[in-house]
Amino acid sequence: MTISANKRSVMSLFSDKNDIYSHQVRIVLAEKGVPYELENINPNTISEDFLELNPYANIPTLVDRDLVLFNSRIIMEYLDERFPHPPLMPVYPVLRGKSRLTMHRIEQDWYSLIDIVNKNPESKEAKKALSQLREEMLALGSVFAATSYFMSDEFSLVDCYIAPLLWRMHNLGVQFTGAGGKAIKAYMTKVFQRDSFSQSIGGSAPKHLMDDKE
């Protein structure tokens, strides 16, 4: 299979359905309503053709004609600028800076923990990391409750960071109970019901999470 970048007339996303970074980008593409070809990549069997596109052999990788991008944050910000409607970043520079800092902190503080879990979900280290992640998110219950979405009344790239993380935790059986749990479950219900989220997972998400045990 030849996957030369400059011969592709339709945008292509090289993705792994189980990779949360790829999931971020799929949500953005769905929000923007951008037609694209989805190429599922097995991280254990990387082809030479793919290595020609991305020498780091990581996913997600986006090909837009002769442009090849990797790193989910770079891809998402490119898509938001390339397709400005609906906007997924604030207009004002100060607010954009705050959004970027929030995404950086989510990646450093929370994604680092889920990465430990994904390596070996049954290990002692993974269970400890998952418990820590749950507790840290519950501690921000008031932040989840304060606005319609995370620190904003508009759906944004920050939510595209948080949604795949919460989806992964949901699939691992994590229950958000106790203080902060109600707000997080309300947020999950709202985000998981968005059309873009359903498209990003290739099917329907749970309709309502508020019936879970408090």
UniProtKB/Swiss-Prot annotation:
Residues 9-87 form the GST N-terminal domain. GO terms for cellular component: cytoplasm. Pfam families: GST_C, GST_N. Residues 92-209 form the GST C-terminal domain. Belongs to the GST superfamily. HSP26 family. Forms an equimolar complex with the RNA polymerase holoenzyme (RNAP) but not with the core enzyme. This is Stringent starvation protein A homolog. It comes from Haemophilus ducreyi (strain 35000HP / ATCC 700724).
